Amino acid sequence: MNSDIISGKWTQLKGKAQAKWGDLTDDDFKVAEGNAEYLQGKLQERYGWDRDRAQTEVRAFEKSLRDDT
């Protein structure tokens, strides 16, 4: 997975991610620091999603960020 967008601009994007996934805590986002795999794991944990669903959600989020630029 190409997570350059997430890791490269994490500070700016964290607010959008928090708005999208409100069940994740500020600490979750601090630890994630743009790491897409960690973020996927937290989505699985908090939302009860399987790995594929969490990966799909993160990829869709990345795509929405690319489309915004």
UniProtKB/Swiss-Prot annotation:
It holds the Pfam family CsbD. Disulfide bonds: none annotated. InterPro entries: CsbD, UPF0337_stress_rsp, YjbJ, YjbJ_sf. Belongs to the UPF0337 (CsbD) family. PANTHER family: UPF0337 PROTEIN YJBJ. This is UPF0337 protein XAC4007. It comes from Xanthomonas axonopodis pv. citri (strain 306).
